[in-house]
A protein has these predicted regions:
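Coupling and communication elements adjacent to P-loop NTPase active sites across diverse families
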Residues: 1-24, 102-157, 237-358
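Conserved beta-strand
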Residues: 18-21, 30-42, 70, 351-357, ...
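ABC ATPase nucleotide-binding domain signature region
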Residues: 40-44, 55-117, 215, 375-386, ...
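ABC-family P-loop ATPase nucleotide-binding domains
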Residues: 87-153, 416-487, 492
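Conserved beta-strand-loop-alpha-helix hinge in the C-terminal portion
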Residues: 90-95, 222-247, 537-548
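Hydrophobic anchor residue at the start of the ABC signature
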Residues: 161, 189, 475, 494
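Catalytic Walker B motif of ABC-type/P-loop ATPase nucleotide-binding domains
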Residues: 172-176, 181, 415, 487-492, ...
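Conserved D-loop/post-Walker B switch-helix segment of ABC ATPase nucleotide-binding domains
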Residues: 182-191, 495-507, 524
Length: 548
């Protein structure tokens, strides 16, 4: 454990302090116990697997939830940006910014209708500060009486962030602030975090954002570990620990083998001594009492040796079990991808002057030309609303072009961030059999086991799964049939995943030997997939991306 601070759990001038805090889920399941942490004017990221309690920890910090045990102390103001918020139908821009009432007071005064109290309370710099905050998040000239619900999800996130800039809390708490945002909005969030004058506590799987923090809190069922530095330094230390865990496992396996051999040899020696002792006793002329005493001493000596050997064996087995547990925590997300058998020269996709229209004759996309050959990897980027999801549906064959043609001579599969091919009320076995109707229940269980849904896990219902589990289940269903798809189309697959799950998906897709078309705003994800080219969808046209 390390930190930039002399005491990583207690930074100087703490704004929020958690002392011996415990948290439970509504059904009583424990998330963490006896957690002691402090957050000051540094930038802190909280990482950990889905379900470990990251959002719960943020809510405790922000004062939105109370701990089951322990205490939370706050000094100064705290601002909260939730992962997803649905505005009321009549909520305006001014409401979301938190300035509706002071703005109304200012307008009454400016119109000459204000009371003496209005005159005293009027904030004469409010409109200027509001416009500056909106411009800072890319929403310049937004009318304060416009409905918030008319904005896109990404624009609403920007708007709430502008409200926080206006409020200027001492501590900013952000839960997955870059989810569903395009590259430009993600960069804006990262700049806000990097430049925030107070403290920041955030949960995110956006590795570019995690590089902007001063320390990382790794949350698990065992508690919290605090690491100084940003994401890259954290990964370096984590990977070193994982390599050490693998070495410890190898040593533990060798040690248990050595103890087993030594125990076997000791038992054989003792058996030989026992046989020799019995033979000597039978041929001895010594008094019986002396022979009995010698036999008892030999028996006690043998028993001591057996007890010592048993203690060694138990210690070695305990070390082995501990080493296996450490490694299993790392290995448990390793996925196995079957080969697609795609030849290098096979044409996988050919868009020839393809056009997609909506609402009658309004052109959304096209004319589009795109050719994929062999196991080529293509990333498609572009701002939200550009039509990327529609393009992927066209590529996967879920929609047809209004004009032009789409040639797709291989089997294709589309995986979106919701894993929509799966139905919430079906079990994983049922879903696999529905998507692979020629298969058997035994084949379904074997296939799901390759993707870590073993035994009773295969009987779980889709609606019970986390985002990462749903994507893993969808991969299992499409990749383990009789004919795995030779073209895999991915639409923002890393949304809703924790970082361990993202890295597991990256590793699995890196081993995929078919063609790949992926839409993602996660630059690290695209880089780790080692795509051959990146195309930008802009104004309905595909063109080489100028983004490095």
């Amino acid at each position: 454990m390390s930190s930039l601070n002399p005491s990583p759990n207690r930074p100087a001038s703490a704004l929020v302090t958690l002392n011996g805090v415990a948290a439970r889920t509504p059904d009583g399941r424990g998330l963490f116990d006896n957690l002691t942490l402090a957050f000051g004017r540094e930038r802190t990221a909280v990482v950990g697997r889905n379900g470990v309690g990251k959002t719960t920890l943020l809510r405790l910090v922000a004062g939105l939830s109370e701990p089951a045990e322990g205490s939370v102390t706050r000094i100064g103001s705290v601002g909260w940006l939730a992962q997803a918020q649905t505005p009321a139908d009549d909520e305006t821009i001014a409401d979301t910014l938190g300035v509706a009432e002071p703005l109304a007071i200012l307008h009454r005064v400016l119109a000459g209708d204000g009371s003496l109290d209005d005159m005293a309370e009027a904030d004469w710099t409010l409109e200027e500060r509001m416009q500056t905050a909106l411009a800072d998040v890319g929403l310049a000239d937004l009318a304060p009486n416009r409905r918030t619900a008319d904005l896109s999800g990404g624009e609403q996130t920007r708007l709430r962030l502008a409200g926080l800039k206006l409020a200027a809390p001492d501590l900013l708490v952000l839960d997955e602030p870059t989810n569903h945002l395009d590259a430009e909005a993600r960069a804006m969030i990262a700049d806000v975090v990097g430049d925030w004058p107070g403290g920041v506590v955030l949960v995110s799987h956006d590795r570019a954002l995690l590089r902007r923090v001063d320390r990382i809190v790794e949350l698990s069922s065992l508690g919290a570990r605090v690491h100084g530095g940003g994401w890259d330094l954290y990964v370096e230390r984590r990977d070193a620990e994982r390599a050490a865990a693998e070495r410890d496992l190898e040593q533990a396996e060798r040690a248990i083998g050595r103890v087993q051999r030594e125990t076997q040899m000791a038992q054989e020696r003792q058996a030989r001594r026992d046989r020799a002792g019995k033979a000597a006793r039978a041929n001895s002329s010594d008094p019986k009492i002396l022979l009995d005493a010698q036999a008892q001493r030999a028996e006690e000596s043998g028993a001591r040796g057996q007890r010592l050997a048993e203690r060694k064996r138990q210690a070695a087995e305990a070390d082995l079990a501990q080493a296996r547990e450490r490694v299993e925590r790392v290995r448990q997300l390793a996925l196995s991808m079957p080969s697609t058998g795609l030849p290098a020269g096979r044409v996988v996709l050919n868009l020839n002057e393809a056009v997609v229209t909506i609402e009658g004759d309004r052109r959304l996309l096209g004319p589009l030309c795109l050719r994929l050959t062999g196991p080529e990897r293509v990333a498609v980027v572009g701002p939200n609303g550009a039509g990327k999801t529609t393009l992927l549906k066209l590529i996967a064959g879920l929609i047809e072009p209004s004009s032009g043609s789409v040639e797709r001579p291989v089997r294709a599969a589309l995986l979106d961030q919701q894993a929509a091919m799966l139905q919430a009320d079906e079990t994983l076995v049922e879903g696999w059999l529905r998507l692979n109707p020629q298969g058997t229940p035994n084949a379904a269980r074997a296939a799901l086991a390759r993707f870590l849904f073993r035994n009773v896990q295969a009987d779980r219902r889709v609606g019970e799964l986390s985002g990462g589990e749903r994507l893993r289940a969808a991969l299992a269903c499409v990749m383990t049939g009789a004919q795995p798809p030779q073209l895999l189309v991915l639409d923002e697959p890393t949304n809703h995943l924790d970082i361990d799950a993202v890295e597991a998906v990256e590793a699995a897709l890196s081993a995929y030997d078919g063609a790949l078309v992926v839409v993602s705003h996660d630059a690290d994800f695209i880089e780790n997939l080692r795509v051959d080219r990146t195309l930008e969808l802009k104004n309905g046209q595909l063109q080489p991306s100028t983004t490095p």
